[in-house]
Regions:
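Cleavable N-terminal export/targeting peptides
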Residues: 1-43
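Outer-membrane beta-barrel pore domains
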Residues: 22-23, 77, 240-417
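Soluble non-cytosolic domains of exported or imported proteins
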Residues: 27-30, 80, 202-203, 308
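Intrinsically disordered, low-complexity regions of eukaryotic proteins
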Residues: 24, 39, 46-49, 65, ...
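Outer membrane beta-barrel
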Residues: 47-72, 77-236, 314, 319-339, ...
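Generic recognition of long tandem-repeat/solenoid scaffolds
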Residues: 45-46, 266
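Hydrophobic alpha-helical membrane context
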Residues: 14-15, 99, 397, 401
Length: 417
């Protein structure tokens, strides 16, 4: 269609030129050619814009785990194993003018879930970006790091305890290049941590979340990141889920961080969560850590668990053996894998703890993880981790019996397309 249009315009220009004097004809021809160039540029720009409207992609992760001890306490701590699809996703995304969108479908063996359905409006000059739909809440640096970019196979127990990940809502965020500050604030439907998502009158239970970060780049691949976040979440008499985290091994028979072990779950009026985060990058080395607390307000103020606090932390270091450096996303305030990484090796280690104990119930898990990853290219990665966890607290015997420690070897094949 474009070629036909250009051909007709060329014929028209030639006809006009032959009907006039030579000088006038040359001038007319130049004008026509200029118009043709402008029209062609407009067509190409339109085609490029249309191409951005739909982009298809996906993520496949296959995991295999071997575990014993506390992770398999239901089977007397004997060695267990499993292989499963950790993530199987299809995505579609695009943009037109000031509006961007992305949708991710998560495939399980018997279900398909809309994991993310995000629209972003970027049309406010020198103003915030507005996003709405089913979006990721801005809670903890570790939880905000995409599974594509993680140095270890699973996130820290603290991050999995505190983050609700993707929830329906609306949020605004903005980065200020002159100061390195970034803020994010959002209001979301709270159907996480056992909350049903509505109160007794069928009104939506809401969560308000905010995160403030600061980053300073000393030179290329040398920067510091500091941040804090907080979240207030209405529970509206819903029972707080007993299990907080698995202790960094997916699909074990026992989830080791459990506030109700040896006791009971409790209905909540609301809960508060807040934390601080820090990271430092020096070329191929990245160190980061976070500390966070969950405070609960029970529906019955006379409950023994009213105003109970649950604390967690982790410290992690990773190093690219082949010299690459992680990239830092200023707009999202998080780290990504090295750009264009290929035929590269990375090692990482982490110590973490999540304490879900109270005076009479609950468990605490402390985990040590070490791992190595091989990047075939920027879309393909093989990972191997070793994990050792210790369980303690008044609910330990009820949860794991005499199996107070557990070991695991975890493996992953990752492919993006």
């Amino acid at each position: 269609m474009h070629k036909t249009t250009i051909g007709l315009l060329c014929l028209a220009a030639t006809y006009q030129a032959s009907a006039q004097t030579e000088s006038a004809g040359n001038q007319s021809l130049e004008n026509r050619l200029s118009q043709l160039e402008q029209q062609l540029a407009s067509m190409e720009a339109k085609d490029a814009s249309d191409d951005k409207w739909v982009t298809l992609g996906g993520r496949l992760q296959i995991d295999a785990n071997i575990f014993d001890g506390a992770y398999n306490a239901d089977n007397e701590g004997n060695t267990g194993s499993t292989i499963f699809p950790r993530r199987a996703r299809l995505s579609v995304e695009g943009e037109r003018s000031d509006l961007e969108y992305k949708m991710i479908l998560e495939f399980a063996e018997e279900t398909i879930e809309i994991l993310l359905l995000r629209f972003e409006y970027t049309g406010f000059e020198n103003g915030p970006t507005i996003k709405f739909g089913k979006i990721r809440e801005d809670i903890t640096l570790d939880a905000l790091t995409s599974s594509k970019h993680m140095a270890l196979i699973e996130r820290a127990s603290m991050a999995n305890t505190m983050s609700p990940y993707f929830r329906w809502g609306v949020a605004a965020y903005q980065y200020f290049p002159s100061t390195g500050l970034r803020y994010a604030v959002g209001v979301h439907k709270n159907d996480a941590f056992g909350a049903e998502g509505t109160d007794d009158d069928s009104a939506i239970s809401l969560a308000t979340t905010g995160r403030l970060t600061w980053a300073h780049e000393f030179k290329e691949n040398n920067l510091i990141h500091l941040g804090s976040w907080g979240s207030y979440r209405k529970m509206d008499n819903s029972q707080l889920s007993a299990s907080f985290a698995r202790a960094e091994v997916r699909e074990p028979n026992v989830r080791l961080v459990n506030y109700a072990a040896g006791g009971d779950t409790v209905p909540l009026d609301h809960l508060n969560q807040y934390g601080i985060e820090a990271a430092y990058q020096y070329n191929s080395l990245l160190v980061q850590g976070e500390v966070a607390r969950r405070n609960i307000a029970t529906s019955d103020p006379a409950s023994l668990l009213d105003d109970e606090n649950y604390d967690g932390y982790y410290f992690q270091a990773s190093y690219m053996l082949t010299g690459e450096s992680k990239s830092y996303s200023k707009g999202s305030a998080r780290f990504n894998q090295p750009k264009g990484v290929e035929d590269a090796w990375e090692i990482a280690a982490r110590v973490s703890s999540m304490d879900a104990t109270s005076e009479f119930q609950g468990t605490r898990a402390k985990s040590f993880t070490a791992g190595v990853s091989y990047y075939i290219d920027e879309n393909t990665k093989i990972m191997l981790n070793g994990v050792h966890s210790k369980v303690s607290g008044p609910g330990t015997e009820a949860l794991v019996g005499d199996e107070t420690s557990g070991n695991a070897i975890t493996m992953r094949f990752h492919y993006d397309f």
